[in-house]
Amino acid sequence: MKAPFDFVIEPKGNRYNNTKKVGDKDLILNTEVFNHQFVNREAIVKSVPTAYNTKIKPGDTVIVHHNVFRRWLDVKGREKNSKSYFNENTYLVKPDQIFLYKRQCDWLAMDGYCFVQPIKQRNSLDVETEEQCIGIVKYTDGINKTGELVGFTPFSTYEFIIDGKRLYRVMNKFITIKYEYQGDEEAYNPSWAQSS
């Protein structure tokens, strides 16, 4: 199946990532359909749009918007699928719903985005565990360099768990400063974000 303007994708695994392996048992973390934090965001590309060229190829793994696989309840309490839904294993998504793609072993950001890993709090008197609005560029579209220490505007991030690491998706236009490394910066990844 091909679409003229949409990517055709299928979820990698289930629609929701709401279980965690504890020993030989599965622990259910969430049973609500409306909580976006437990929606699967990884997908496999089945086909690319036919109307234009794209960097993404069939077979690539992509990170998509949290509403793509999400189910929700309408005003009458009926469960509905997202507007991307075609059938249980097929979804149609627009290019602006894809933020990151993986070819072979490398993650690459879509144009206009980069993914930033937060750093640990350097001030021992601060109660926060991570520095606010500062991080290390992990994946980029080429505008910023991987490994750069950058600052970004407040409320401009969106949290993702990618390969067991918590990262923030930041639009390039919201990166406001590039810092020099001081040598005491350390990436921060909370234990709950790590893969089991």
Predicted regions: what is each one?
Residues 1-196:
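Acidic-enriched and Gly/Ser
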